[in-house]
Amino acid sequence: MPIITLPDGSKREFANPVSTLDVALDIGPGLAKACIAGRVNGELKDATDLITADSELAIITAKDEEGVEILRHSCAHLLGHAIKQMWPETKMAIGPVIDNGFYYDIDLDHKLTHEDIEALEKRMLALAKTNYDVVKKVVSWQEARDAFDGRGEEYKIAILDENISKDATPALYHHEEYIDMCRGPHVPNMRFCQNFKLMSVAGAYWRGNSDNKMLQRVYGTAWADKKALKTHLVRLEEAAKRDHRKIGKQLDLYHMQEEAPGMVFWHNDGWSIFLELEKFIRQKLGQYTYQEVKGPLMMDRVLWERSGHWDKYAEAMFTTNSENREYAIKPMNCPGHVQIFNQGLKSYRDLPLRMAEFGCCHRNEPSGSLHGLMRVRGFTQDDAHVFCTDDQVQEEVSACIQMVYDTYATFGFDNIVVKLSTRPEKRIGDDDMWDRAEDALKQALANNNIKYEILPGEGAFYGPKIEFTLHDCLDRAWQCGTVQLDYALPTRLGATYVAEDNSRQTPVMIHRAILGSLERFIGILIEEYAGKFPTWLAPMQVVVMNITDKQADYVEEIVKFFKEQGIRASFDLRNEKIGFKIREHTLRRVPYLLVVGDQEMENKEVAVRTRDGIDLGKLKLEDFAAMIRQQISLRSLKLLEE
């Protein structure tokens, strides 16, 4: 007689084993209709799985995040159902849930077209609208293998042979005549899977290995209701308009080319933004009392072996040989900073020692993962390392956290999600070291009243880390900042200081990045602002235009004056109509467009309008320059009169 305890503390007693669906029905028919699955003693279970002992139960509906993930996973099965009806010869590989949706990798000789995807989506919807029940059957390993062998599903057989123990009892989910294998849970009925859209098709190697066959990957998105689906599709349309690759080309900020995959060619205006970010971070480094250093781009393999990178990170490192020595181009800056720390005797009085670098790093990312500025092979990190004592860890980590929040606020990012990544399988150091490091970061977060979630196994190989994920105007998540605690690397590389009792001690090392990759952060900013950078970041802050040739000399004088004031300004003296010039520079997203005619020249004024078409009227040249200088100095996010 299981006693079921619900989240509100109430209890319900049943004479026989019950399913989550039974409990939901006992509470009310409305809840039963909405029930997707159950969380039984903290573990997600199918709505029809029987509960045989006293348990805590939370009923999962489409209002829960887990409910939406489950229906997305079931939509992947629905996609498989439809594909097998339309192309029975298809061999199904894997169909997991991803952010906002799902995909299925399929082996099909016929290359899917846009028209095929539209037809496939219609077939999926027609199937879902029959509201058929999804039937789960738990079978033996051999029964599962026989089922897929009879259907010629070689990829499912490979998964069973290579990934699932023969003692296991896999779950097969029956979608009418279609069968799929999964840990689950899945929806009990396809009425939950009617708000979806197939998005695209791409190539994907089986198991992500380029030595294997290239499959077709069909992507889809799925939501709890029509409104949520529509909102997401509108957001995607807006994201496409803001695509940094498109805007970067329109504004002539940078380019990339096949001869240097994953490497950025910065053009003048893009490099201007890069330098402004560097300048801003340098000011922050001064406020928080950092040294700035510069380490070599390439170091001997021996050093990377001592640091542990060669063993744990070699596949991501570019290497070269010279005079019978093997070198690695640095993927990160930390080993170099330890070498700088090791020069000269350090005392406890020298700690904390905060060392920062705009470090040029390279990582051998897979070519298929490269994506504009967001995923590159060559990048610049606003990297820093703090060498301190155990007693200083809490204060130093707290200062790093405050620096992250101060910096993000300047760009208008105030929705920050914090995650704590803990020890991975491949790591250096013993469990005691990892316990101390993880506990120290947890305490620092608690001291700053910061809510966080734990990401088990996602830490760096040398230490746990706090990850700061900012959410942009489209509510997309971008993981940028990190604060990592490291007891291992200083030991491996022989870093020591003289303690107060004259003993030699190993410092604790805090790894800290705020923007992360400057290249990636610029990509994020391009999309956040849709190319309309705040004045302080804008490559060109002011453009001055004449109406006739009579004002040309005065316009050049104005631009010279602005440049002397530290304002990035240019002139447009072309023999074009003023409306044409205004439109062109509006498309270039220049914050301020200044027009000079005879009257403005006579009165030493400028007619000012913003890139958004707001007419600020006529202003004295000195007054306007003072306003702009203040905007730049304050790093204001808004233009005048906004």
Curated annotation (Swiss-Prot):
Name of this protein: Threonine--tRNA ligase
Keyword Zinc: yes
Location(s) in or outside the cell: Cytoplasm
Region of interest (Catalytic), ranges: 243-534
Protein task: Catalyzes the attachment of threonine to tRNA(Thr) in a two-step reaction: L-threonine is first activated by ATP to form Thr-AMP and then transferred to the acceptor end of tRNA(Thr). Also edits incorrectly charged L-seryl-tRNA(Thr).
Any one of the GO CC terms: cytosol
One example of a Gene Ontology biological process annotation: threonyl-tRNA aminoacylation
E.C. no: 6.1.1.3
Keyword match GTP-binding: no
InterPro entries in the record: aa-tRNA-synt_IIb, aa-tRNA-synth_II, aa-tRNA-synth_II/BPL/LPL, Anticodon-bd, Anticodon-bd_dom_sf, Beta-grasp_dom_sf, TGS, TGS-like
Domain TGS: 1-61
Family affiliation: Belongs to the class-II aminoacyl-tRNA synthetase family.
Oligomer and partners: Homodimer.
Catalytic activity: tRNA(Thr) + L-threonine + ATP = L-threonyl-tRNA(Thr) + AMP + diphosphate + H(+)
Protein species of origin: Shewanella frigidimarina (strain NCIMB 400)
Chief place of localization: cytoplasm
Positions with a binding annotation for Zn(2+): 334, 385, 511
